[in-house]
Amino acid sequence: MELRAEEISEIIKKQINEYGKEVEVSETGTIISIGDGIARIHGLAGAMAGELLEFPGGVSGMVLNLEEDNVGAAILGEFAEIKEGDTVKRTGRITEVPVGDALVGRVVNAIGQPIDGKGPINSSTFSKVEIKAPGIVARKSVHQPMATGLKAIDSMVPIGRGQRELIIGDRQTGKTAVAVDTIINQKGGDVICIYVAIGQKRSTVAQVVSKLTEHGAMDYTIVVAATASESAPLQFIAPYTGVTMGEYFRDNKKHALIIYDDLSKQAVAYRQLSLLLRRPPGREAYPGDVFYLHSRLLERACKLSDECGAGSLTALPIIETQAGDVSAYIPTNVISITDGQIYLESDLFFSGVRPAINVGLSVSRVGGSAQTKSMKQVAGTLRLNLAQYREMAAFAQFGSDLDKATQMQLARGERLVEILKQPQYRPIPNEKQVLVIFAANNGYLDDYPVSALKKYETELYAFFDNRQADVLTELREKQAIGDDLKAKLVSALDQFKKEFTA
């Protein structure tokens, strides 16, 4: 076969022209030690704090420690296959997660990957997990109500949009129940809810998701789960992932509600990370910056000013106490960061008062200005009556012969406590709450035994729904009780009193 010089030169020219000059430069390092979700890497001299790293097998990591000769990183995923000597690549990006409407109705893990078996999430928008909270100028004071549907909270510890209200109590006192009821109560409204489960059993998270689905609440809810079986880095980052997703709605002129269940477990995960990274321990072996861990998270919940779009992000963090000790390190930290707390007591819970809210220790520092006028009108008397009842009840234990006025006050107090009880998954709209508290304050319940009050309440709602719907509509729309509306309420309640038999 004859070789022709022109053909050979043609082939060589073609090869030269098609030769790719692209050169990819990536900074890599070598793992020098790994264990418990923490890797120490040598050779990443240019790494940034919080930067995303690429480990073998497609696993991500996040830079936490920058030291002279090595970098400490938390591995965000399964690290069983990663070993010493493996190569780690820098990405040049700060850790980010997917955000947007595509996530609504889904269950995702701590880095935003779907875990509900419903296929991939088609979101092209990503946001950084760690960003600064809005400044003072970008904010507005809380002035719109965030209704929970729970009589005891909406009347005496009201929450506003953009507020941070702590739910605190021992285990098994109904903390998650309060949070889940608040999510269910947003049905038909304009609030997107995010439920972040940190360090919980998978069965518990599955139960919450099935309850939300059953009540049609998953249509406007995102669930972020970092369960007890997952590594400490994932439990540490999950709340930041959740708040990043919430901020997307806040910054797009919408309203969002986020629940962290619970931050005690996040603090424990962070303590584990810090000790493994050899950071010096402080009180209760927590690192010195555990306050900053929670403050930078909760400061991202706020009500934005009209110039910034008037969106809001409301946070309900949950803290679990040990034997009612609210003066421990983490509880006092979070109490000082938030705008109030709902304190749930195990004694009340076991005595049948559910939600088990201790009204004396619970407070809302900014929610009062967000309460509807009608609720404010009836709740002022309610709080006073309950406070007097508790004082009287304490003294009544010592004396047997009580005068008529004291007996009446004790009887009224018992009925108020009874009327504030509420079954789980049954939130009540604002106008019906106002109605029943108005009836209690004005002595309509005094003639009936405490055992008949549940029946009274159910039949009262049915009576107004069927025969006095216009009064309920007026209560809902006016959101204040004027003289004419008060007269209508009194006449309707008098009519109901004649018909009701205990």
Curated annotation (Swiss-Prot):
Keywords for this protein: ATP synthesis, ATP-binding, Cell inner membrane, Cell membrane, CF(1), Hydrogen ion transport, Ion transport, Membrane, Nucleotide-binding, Translocase, Transport
Top enzyme class: translocase
PROSITE patterns, alphabetized: ATPASE_ALPHA_BETA
Marked site (Required for activity) residue numbers: 362
Annotated compartments: Cell inner membrane
General function of this protein: Produces ATP from ADP in the presence of a proton gradient across the membrane. The alpha chain is a regulatory subunit.
PANTHER family linked to this entry: ATP SYNTHASE SUBUNIT ALPHA, MITOCHONDRIAL
Protein name: ATP synthase subunit alpha
The species this protein was found in: Trichlorobacter lovleyi (strain ATCC BAA-1151 / DSM 17278 / SZ)
Gene coding for it: atpA
